[in-house]
């Protein structure tokens, strides 16, 4: 795919993952707290990455090329998809429990943006791609920790209420 069209794959893939969350996760009885959205978003993203990796590896020209592709994608594409799933889940969870539409838009457009940047940069430099990916991992980790912190406060508040009687 020419590099000027490489961003389209990220837009399409993240739209598909977002659609899966909207159609299948939003109405689950088990989806009862914001952290669940991160879990489901990451699960959907890693499932997608698995299918995508099978396609790349099994459609390569030789066994040596398959190993090379699998190795590179294990350290770049899989973390990318996981991070995009965390970001999508974080903002979708905020949307689901607050109703603020801006969170819904962020849950779709931020992963699209990061995925498009990743795809575009892979056409130029693996080193720059890895640096962008490291920054993305840091961002996704900070969002996850923010939810974990909020959740621990909720748990402590519930424990306090239960201990009072």
What are these regions (language model features)?
Residues 1-165:
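Hydrophobic alpha-helical segments at protein termini of multi-pass membrane proteins
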């Amino acid at each position: 795919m020419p590099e000027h069209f490489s961003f389209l794959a990220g837009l399409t893939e993240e739209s598909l993952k977002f659609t899966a969350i909207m159609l299948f996760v939003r109405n689950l009885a088990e989806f009862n707290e914001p952290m669940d959205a991160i879990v489901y978003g990451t699960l959907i993203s890693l499932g997608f990455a698995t299918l995508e990796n099978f396609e790349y590896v099994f459609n390569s020209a030789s066994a040596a090329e398959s190993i090379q592709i699998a190795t590179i994608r294990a350290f770049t594409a899989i973390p990318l998809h996981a991070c995009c799933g965390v970001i999508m889940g974080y903002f979708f969870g905020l949307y689901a429990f607050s109703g603020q539409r801006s969170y819904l838009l962020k849950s779709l457009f931020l992963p699209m943006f990061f995925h498009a940047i990743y795809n575009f940069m892979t056409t130029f430099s693996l080193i720059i791609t890895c640096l962008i990916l490291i920054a993305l991992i840091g961002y996704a980790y900070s969002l996850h920790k923010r939810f974990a912190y909020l959740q621990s406060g909720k748990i402590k508040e519930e424990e306090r209420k239960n201990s009072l009687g």
